[in-house]
Amino acid sequence: MMKRTLLIASALLLLGSSRVSAESKIVNNGNGTATVICSQGLLGPEKWDKQVKPIDKKGYITIFDGKSLGGWRGYGKNHIPSKWEVTPDGCLSFKGKEAAKDEEGGDLIFAHKFKNFELTLQWKVDKGSNSGILYLAQEVIKPDGSKVEPIYISAPEYQVLDNQNHPDAKLGKDHNRQSASLYDMIPAKPQNSKPYGEWNEAKIRVQNGTVSHYQNGVLVVQYKLWTPEWTKMLQASKFSEAKWPVAFYLLDNCGGANHEGYIGLQDHGDRVWYRNIKVKEL
């Protein structure tokens, strides 16, 4: 037990504890905008950026408006990886196999930590494509101090998938790797995704540990973090303590000490588009 604990502790060099205090609550400026404090990078000196974003009367902040990537950066990076682009029609897209060989990939995060929130967006995939929406993500440094662990070992994932043509749709258990599922743990029911090339509506709500996934206006997944049931689900997944102890520890303590984290979009190597990304603090 001690050896295992030390192994995990050496891997979990979280750059979050010193940053949390600087990430103040979002300020509604009263003029249709809100000020959001975002971290500019993971490694090196802490730097902060004040982003002014549109906010509507219901409290939804537009964190991607089809034009600007202000507040976004690569996971574990201080810049936007070049395989991500804003398309002429106002989408945030990962180029996938259409990217040049020398272009940089990697997951993308909106660099403000959210605790209780509701996220809404639209997504579509190319034929056979795979991606994901991650939440409560942490940036976890590997023991050598130079790289980060994969984002998905600290963050629950709302699966984004072409259910008809990607092999992952038939893997896992009871279709728990299909779109809108809590990846590898809870299948989305009913499974009401639209085919590749068509837009899907996604909503993720996190409030005091209760998490809800919606797909095309329908509640398809609901579960409770930080409970014995959550731990049991992890133990039955690819993130179990026996299979992947670091991932198990991080996900069992999802969101860290403050139960908050980043919203992320996954680079799974495939073409995907996102648009109208909005978030509301609860």
Model-derived regions: residue spans:
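N-terminal secretory signal peptides that target proteins for export/translocation
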Residues: 1-2
